[in-house]
Regions:
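Catalytic glycan-binding domains that act on GlcNAc-containing polysaccharides
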Residues: 1-170
Length: 170
């Protein structure tokens, strides 16, 4: 499946595997708070995050309404990120794709998750068939757009390289 997404969309398979490993431990951990409650709490408890959280809560309600999902049924992080790819609602609404062709963009089904991550990276500057992952490269910046932390990108890139090295060695 990873190779199918990689071949179809042109995104490095090791990067895809690295991202879902960092974000959700390959789907094992994707949050313990309901996304609705997490965002609502941010609005009222952290004034400096209130405007952002209000926008994300609105995006989440749009997502749930459009897919006939109970807004209290999806668990995520304290910041409202959810699913195997830990998308925030606005990112999910803007970048998630229906890779498996079942007419639904799933946050918890691997074909759609991997396809959506690849789509996010591509829409944020990832260059297919470019093996430059050095700091400041377009591929590095596409991961930085996913999570705006230099440390995060560094860890993702280190894990990507380690996975690649181990697979190539075997």
């Amino acid at each position: 499946l990873v190779m199918q997404v990689s071949d179809s969309m042109g995104v490095d398979p090791y990067l895809l595997v690295s991202l879902v490993g960092i974000e959700s431990n390959y789907g094992r951990h994707h949050g313990q708070y309901t996304v609705f409650n997490a965002l609502y709490t941010l609005i009222h408890q952290l004034p400096r995050k209130g405007k952002w959280a209000s926008k994300e809560l609105a995006e989440f309600i749009i997502l749930c309404h459009g897919n006939k999902i109970d807004p209290h049924s999806i668990s995520g992080s304290y910041a409202g990120a959810f699913g195997y790819g830990q998308f925030i609602p606005s990112s999910f609404n803007n970048y998630a794709i229906d890779f498996d062709g079942d007419s639904v963009r799933h946050h918890d089904k691997w074909p759609d998750v991997l396809g959506s991550i690849a789509n996010y990276l591509l829409k944020n500057g990832y260059k297919p068939d470019n093996d430059d992952y050095s700091k400041g490269s377009r591929n590095w910046k596409s991961v930085f757009a996913y999570n705006r932390s230099n440390n995060y990108v560094g860890v993702v890139m280190e894990l990507r390289q380690e996975i690649k090295n181990r697979i190539i060695e075997n």
